[in-house]
Design a protein with these regions (language model features):
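Flexible, compositionally biased loop and terminal segments
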Residues: 1-155
Length: 155
């Protein structure tokens, strides 16, 4: 996220918004390492990652960047410990429940990329609801890659 912040700050200082990208893509990686470095449990690292994501979404929308793609949960993430996967599933629920109204107010369109069918019922429902509620929105397109893996694209 450091490069994103540097690019945005640089453009804002110069008031050169034409040089901002139309589409920003971020791989959410390193939350566990961050937590370990700060002597916190992995779940706290993921929570901090979600807080940073909220910030990035707001800045991206404020700057009128057209699309933001977040690679949040790969197909390989299912192989993590049961506790970590459970914490990530709870974060999905918490994020959408707390953010959906603001995202709707900001006219954000949400697209979930990846196989939704494998998610537990509540998570699957909240993902489908977010897509359906925002389908007609015309502002920022927020692509969230969940249960997504590049290997699936190769077949």
């Amino acid at each position: 996220m450091g490069i994103f912040k540097k690019t945005v700050r640089s453009a804002m200082v110069r008031e050169d918004f034409a040089k901002l990208p139309r589409h920003v893509a971020i791989i959410m990686d390193g939350n566990g390492r961050w937590a370990k470095k700060h002597k916190l449990n992995v779940a706290m690292g993921h929570r901090q990652g979600v807080e940073t994501l909220r910030e990035v979404i707001r800045h991206t929308d404020d700057l009128k960047i057209e699309a933001l793609t977040i690679y949040a949960f790969s197909t390989e993430n299912w192989n993590r410990s049961k506790e970590e996967v459970g914490a990530l599933m709870q974060l999905i629920l918490d994020f959408f429940k707390s953010e959906i109204d603001e995202l709707m107010e900001k006219n954000v369109r949400i697209l979930i990329l990846g196989e939704k069918d494998v998610f537990p019922g509540k998570q699957r429902e909240v993902l489908i609801e977010a897509e359906n509620r925002s389908a007609a929105n015309t502002g920022l397109t927020l692509n969230i890659c969940l249960n997504y893996g590049g290997r699936a694209e190769l077949t």
